[in-house]
Amino acid sequence: MTLYDLLELPQTATLQEIKTAYKRLAKRYHPDINKQGADTFVKINNAYAVLSDTTQKAEYDAMLRFSEFEDRVKRLDFSIKWHEQFMEELQFHHNWDFDFIRNREYTQPTPTNNKYSSFLDKDVSLAFYQLYSKGKLDFDLEDTLLRRHSIKQAFLKGKKLNDVLKEQYNYLGWLEAKRYFNIDVEIELTPKEVREGGVVNLPLKIKVISNNYPGQMWYELNKNYSFRLLWDIKNGEVAEFFGKGNRALGWRGDLIVRMRIVDKIKKRLRIFSSHFEQDKTKLWFLVPQDKQDNPNKWVFDYKTHEFIV
């Protein structure tokens, strides 16, 4: 199965046919209409993101024709494999150019207004993270980006590199895509736990993309955050911790914790998607058992933002 198959189209489909098919299928599988269609809805959105972009579509079509890929596609359902890489393994590549299929010289990604192009372009995403967090770029990254023809030409005309990047790539799209790596959780607490000021553990497995591990594109980092419960916690209170979420392409998502006071705990920890606002335990994270030992000997006071030994 290919991305065209996901949209129920032949590989000769035009951009207009792709757009029409996407609208029809998105309406059919939208979670608000079809409660069982959430996974398919995400898949067809991802397929449309590639096939609706002329540059990425050309790359994908070339890959379909590539003999090595044709041999591989006989042995696996490629749409499922591709979807797993997008949603689970996070094996992102330069501007969706699918370099993992074939070895060739690096080609400069073409600037595009695609919503997630800057997020998927590793160097640009790292640049935006540095601009977002400290307002400047590292020298080595500047040198790498200036090797791109379009950036170099604009820079030589006297424009500031920071402005060139934001003009040629979608900085606002990057900021929006960044939300996908927030971890949005809800914890259930009893009034007794709040009164006694106990400690609640939040064991999470965080997805990480890092160049420090050349043999693999991602790995899982075990984190066990601990919170000291204060007597004045209110039902619905929200605590946000910057940089404590998933990590990818140079930046970190945030951890957002909502407190829910209940008479009896039915489910200690719920993990939600900041995009779909629904239970996300199957998409990104494995939720450990509540009784798991806490390897973290430090307790974090979420109101003072200080660690307690």
Swiss-Prot record:
InterPro entries the record matches: DnaJ_domain, DnaJ_domain_CS, Hsp70_co-chaperone_J-domain, J_dom_sf
Membrane-spanning parts: none
CDD domains named in the record: DnaJ (cd06257)
The keyword Manganese is annotated on this UniProt entry: no
PROSITE patterns, A to Z: DNAJ_1, DNAJ_2
The entry's keywords: Chaperone
Ranges in a coiled coil: none
Domain (J): residue spans on this chain: 1-66
Gene3D superfamilies, per database record: DnaJ domain (1.10.287.110)
GO molecular function, one term: protein-folding chaperone binding
Name of this protein: DnaJ-like protein MG002 homolog
Upper lineage: Bacteria, Bacillati, Mycoplasmatota, Mycoplasmoidales, Mycoplasmoidaceae
